[in-house]
């Protein structure tokens, strides 16, 4: 009987806690409803106008990005094209690739997906054979390399797959996280944790290259397939 008494007392405590929680929720809802009731027609109309203005601004920004070639992963044909494209957009990701490097095709697939998702960033690809001067200027020596640019200046590089877990099977989300770490996309996840991967596997240091002239024009492949 003593056991039944303990159970009854425990049930009563739980019931009281539940009632208290329900009361808090009810009070919060009453408070929000009261706030809405106190908003006059003029204030409500002002809120609607602000919301509509924000929506119009967002739509205009989207159209501007699309007019500049955002929203798709595109190939450019020359160094001159590169400088023009970078000049037009605040955020740019450019894949320096070579046709014979297998890992470039892996990056192509992921970048095509991210280009559609992140309209705020322009996604490009450029064949290194068509851009010898630019590759020297940016120290592009390993293929594939992603140059990450903001306001016309190179912010960072993703060289090979080192920052992506040293695996060909990295996810699109992992590349998205890496680009977010360099602030070239609007990333909404947790930058402290690479998605779906072990933090230890990635480490914390990213490969960054300085803007210096290199001696040779030979490109090293990060892929086993040439």
From Swiss-Prot:
Residues with Phosphoserine modification: 188, 221, 223
An annotated GO cellular component: centrosome
Keyword field: Cytoplasm, Cytoskeleton, Nucleus, Phosphoprotein
Tissue expression: Expressed in testis, liver, heart, kidney, brain, spleen and lung.
Top-level taxon of the source organism: Eukaryota
UniProt signal peptide: none
Thioredoxin domain segment(s): 75-180
KW Nucleus (keyword) present: yes
UniProt cross-references to SUPFAM superfamilies, sorted A to Z: Thioredoxin-like
Pfam families membership: Thioredoxin
Localization: Cytoplasm; Nucleus; Cytoplasm, Cytoskeleton, Microtubule organizing center, Centrosome; Midbody
Functional summary from the UniProt entry: Significantly diminishes the chaperonin TCP1 complex ATPase activity, thus negatively impacts protein folding, including that of actin or tubulin.
Oligomer and partners: Forms ternary complexes with the chaperonin TCP1 complex, spanning the cylindrical chaperonin cavity and contacting at least 2 subunits.
Protein name: Thioredoxin domain-containing protein 9
């Amino acid at each position: 009987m003593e056991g039944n008494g303990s159970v009854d007392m425990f049930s009563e405590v739980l019931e009281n806690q539940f009632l208290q929680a329900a009361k808090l929720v009810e009070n919060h809802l009453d408070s929000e409803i009261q706030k809405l009731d106190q908003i006059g027609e003029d204030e409500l109309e002002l809120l609607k106008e602000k919301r509509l203005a924000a929506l119009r601004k967002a739509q205009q920004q989207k159209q501007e990005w699309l007019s500049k070639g955002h929203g798709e992963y595109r190939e450019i044909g020359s160094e001159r094209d590169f400088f023009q494209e970078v000049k037009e957009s605040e955020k740019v990701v450019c894949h320096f690739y070579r046709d014979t490097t297998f890992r470039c095709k892996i990056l192509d697939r992921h970048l095509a997906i991210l280009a559609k998702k992140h309209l705020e960033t322009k996604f490009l690809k450029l064949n290194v054979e068509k851009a010898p001067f630019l590759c020297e200027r940016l120290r592009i020596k390993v293929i594939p390399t992603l140059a990450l640019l903001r306001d016309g200046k190179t912010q960072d590089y993703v060289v090979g797959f080192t920052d992506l877990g040293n695996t060909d099977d990295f996810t699109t989300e992992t590349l998205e996280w890496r680009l977010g770490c360099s602030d070239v996309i609007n990333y909404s996840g947790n930058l402290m944790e690479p998605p779906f991967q072990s933090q230890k596997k990635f480490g914390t240091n990213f490969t960054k290259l300085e803007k210096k002239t290199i001696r040779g024009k030979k490109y090293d492949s990060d892929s086993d397939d040439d």
